Amino acid sequence: MSKQVEHTPKEYIQIKGARVNNLKNIDVDIPKNKLVVITGMSGSGKSSLAFDTLYAEGQRRYVESLSSYARQFMGRMNKPEVDYIKGIAPAIAIEQRVITSNPRSTVGTSTEIYDYLKLLYARIGKTISPVSGREVTKDSVSSVVDFALNLEEGTTVTLLAPLIPSHGRKLKEELSLLLQKGFVRVVYGDSMQKIEAIIDDKAIVNKDLQDGEVLIVVDRVRIEQDDDTVNRLSDSVQTGFFEGKGELYMEENGQRHHFSHKFELDGITFEEPTPNFFSFNNPYGACRRCEGYGKIIGIDPDLVIPDKSRSVYDGAIAPWRGEKMGEWLQVLVKSSLKFDFPIHRAYMDLTAAQKELLWTGNKYFAGLTQFFEELEAQTYKIQYRVMLSRYRGKTDCPDCRGTRLRKDATYVKVGGKSITDIVLMPLEEALEFFKTLPLVGNELVIAKRLLAEINNRLQFLCDVGLSYLTLNRLSNTLSGGESQRINLATSLGSSLVGSIYVLDEPSIGLHPRDTQRLISVLKSLRDVGNTVVVVEHEQEMMEAADYLIDIGPEAGINGGEMVFAGTYQQILKDTKSLTGQYLSGKSQIEVPKKRRPWSNSVTIKGAHENNLKGIDVQFPLNTFTVVTGVSGSGKTSLVKRILYPALQKSIGNYSGEQTGVYDAIEGDITQIEQVEMVDQNPIGRSSRSNPVTYVKAWDEIRALYANQAPAKAAGLKPAAFSFNVEGGRCDVCQGEGEVKIEMQFMADIVLPCEACGGKRFKQFVLDVHYKNKSVADVLELSVDEAIVFFADQPKILAKLQPLQDVGLGYVKLGQSSSTLSGGEAQRIKLASFLIKGNNSKKTLFIFDEPTTGLHFQDIKKLLKSFDALIALGNSILVIEHNMDMIKSADWVIDIGPEGGNKGGKLVFAGLPEELIHCKDSYTGQFLKAHLKD
């Protein structure tokens, strides 16, 4: 620490006396303009230092510098508990969560790429007629003048405008008006005549006029290359367009050229492209039917044809089963030979045209669309309303086919592609398209800046490992890691300098293959002049860091100290740092001595969801199985979109979530009684939720206190010892222990409740003691302390012991769930399953990256918990990139080989020892180093 005395706020951010959450009055110096990694066990205080102290103060000071008027629109920030922070800059936090639930937000809009695309298409897009495939153009005054000036000098041109008669006027009236306007001649019947001569001809003057039957002679001009000619031509062309309602003819040497001021071709008038024309968030550009959402509540094809492995004859179409509705099917079956429809072929093997025919029908049979329209017409009958509700769901809008834009927006092309083609491409394809876009001349000048911005942002998204996404992908369907990396790419695109970026495990959801690219992105963020602070457990990230800070030594009340601060090489030699011991190999997660054999399994046949290529995958039961693969390879589609909902349906616990596309599910499904998706979401939705209530130990503790003599004498029931119901809890703070005071333009202040002194309960409840402790004192105990305190209470002990087993001995019983990290929340859920023990149903537990936020030591404890669950007869299935987790698995399923369209295949299924010999597997290549031992 002696070195830190020399540090100045010019070179270092100096934090003095940080006391947020479990931080123990620590002093930390963070070097500026460096890549700094903060590491330590889950719950040690990393996030408290990075987010609740450093980011909170950087953001608060920036907001305080704004006017009170501006501040009312900003989130109000708490001042962190710290003596002082010197040398701090404005801070930007890029957290691990999906930032929006807006159904209109997409990857394109959130990264601003779509804004640039709208401008690009509005400025250089060519409108192509869907009838002839020719470009739609519109003439202007200047383009007509330029055409005339390019003719041979001395040529005489005649400008003619078609006479468009007003409703009800005869030829005589129109010609009289032309005379009043100063026109002298017209072309009528292929000859030029004076208007006065025609007016006197009674044979034709009273007849009805057709549009363009008479042409007004606007001017005759001799082409000379001088200003007078240019000015005269300009005036005459403008007059001609006005009189001809946007149309004009130019005659020279017997040739007649047509010019139009209108944007039309093939008898269709097209809209001129503007940025709003391509905006699905604007009524002008949005599809009229779905209003820019891309989906409508309509007939869901997946519900109409639930089993795609069946043929039409075999009952693939669910509403056409049964006697009455089966009549619709019979018409199709009987007439199928007439138009060569394969009624015995599985639905999934039909061509796109054949599938479309089932919906549209033809002259021989009525399709599904007509069938449902007839049901709609009879909704006054309850049986039809019930039937319709069975097949309703969110479906792609039939008008825009899910692209959200009005149909004519797709007529505008750049490089032969419409804007909807671009947003449906994987990002790497879109980047390649724009890099090789052939533009010349004026187009290049207009598009240069726009293309630079588009290419930059696409490049950043590919660099952070998101090349498999599309710009049309909804933001609320992204994982936390994907969402964070999109924010990171957006920050890079904005080129901010002189700020502090605080990131929460950006490597989550990223295969080790892509981690190196992410590191180079973070370094480029540092190199432009920013301080990048990353909370991270990934070894590669630590190796790349300029500076490491290890918070610990353990978690919760046993953490909150700065164990180490220095370089990667220095931490390898540090004996106090647990992180250093794992990095240097002194401590490690051992490879299991033997893998569990298995005989039962569940198989998914023909998985087609998203990018999956119709694969068959076997999932072993009563084992620890890991699904691996690079980002975007199809792991989540396989496990969360197909296996999870399909199993729920099979065992009768269907949640209503739409199942992904697959052919069949087979195997020992009867061996599974329950399916649990264990995520890292908070364990409760309110600040009242805490570990002791979640594992149901508080019920036993309340019963114990209600059984004490003073409680019996006062007639107190167990409910009196609850802070969630009225009776024994403090009436002022309603059992919260604290009150919130709202401050205008400043952060709300949270103070201990004056009535109960932060104890949550009324005095008569606090007077009841067990072993000299009140219920309020018990809530302040850590799990470790509570296990000693309740050693003679087996019921309470049985519910607290699993919390200690999963490594949460340091957590206080009454700690609010809102202060728990994602890893801690997940392990509390695990403990609740361990508590059920042998009494629980045989369960398949599905985890999506359970190592998020976990230190090497935490992963060791998590693996022990997995072993305990499997010993109880359960099965564990994990989607994971962490090599320590993969090497500990009994069975590995590798999906890939790449992300997006190049993925979705089953690369490998077998033992980890065999995976390292699979040449096509990136996971196998990285696993080699971890299986040497």
Model-derived segments and spans:
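Conserved phosphate-binding elements of NTP-dependent enzyme cores
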Residues: 1-933
